[in-house]
Amino acid sequence: MDIPLCQSEHKPQLLLNDPAAIPLYHTAPERFAGALAPNAELCDAWSEELVPLPVGLALACPPEPDAEHCERPITMHYIEQCKEVFRPLLHDDAAFYYLHGAPTFPALRAAVLALGDLCGRTVIAELHVEDDEGHLPDGTDVRAAIGVLQRIGVTTVLISAHDPESLTQALEIAAPYARLSLGVCMHADWLSQTTLYNTEVIVPDITEAFVAALHGNQVSCKTLPRDHDDFICAPDGKHAHFIAPTIDISDEIECGPHLDEDLIEAEDDSGAFKLLLETEEDVVTLEESRYMISRPLCLCAESADLLEQGLRVVPGLALYDGTWEQEDAVISYFETKYGMIRL
């Protein structure tokens, strides 16, 4: 499936997710971008019945491990846990995978990395916003979440919410910064109360109602221009930061027992923190102190393996400024896999 997901002039389009809606697809195929099967059996059946519609599989993210009884780094353990859960569910005929139900944003990012380790299929991810200011339940800014996901292989983000106002606000906040396809999961009775900014895909609750609304031009859609292309989006994992390539970066900060204090001390002196990884224990310390990181983060390590471990546990996008120079092929891989930003 190409990016963006919707290639039709009939936008937004629907993801078929109900067997009862299959006759609607045959009647109005232009209204559908794809189909979302709940299991491999239906994925097989729909792949044959709905040709040429791409059919994907839904994958529920597992619960996060208990921090008190889990080996460190916890993120590494969770990535392996996701692989164990996802591996038997993967299917040759699935055109894409739809990740949903992640308990936190760092968990969703880890699930995306796990799926990327297992296969190279298109990934769609769901983000649930908790308020009308575009925050996820763990407080993550929706712009930060999208900024990370669009650089680690996710091609479409579907936003859900408790109410139409929160959904509208989240779309309006995210649309200027999104460089991937935006979609929504929504109820039909929200149609008159929701404005769909830059929305290409809808996962409906009642497919028939949405087909009728789209046919009758009863869906309020608006386009917002992309903004801030002159700046780099460098989320710390929770907050969105927009930086210039010439951002002031701190001196190297060791990930030792006083990392929290060192981060507080460096907070007013630079635009980004540069953390040095020298041992695997430093990676554990980095993970434990990530909630103290309120600036864009630059990682450096003499060992490419250590640098990769750091990239796996950091929920945001790490900067690379050339300290402890790595091979170009290695940095290119880190850019693709983890969204590392080469300055």
Q: What do these predicted ranges mean?
A:
Residues 1-343:
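Domain-level signal for soluble alpha/beta catalytic cores
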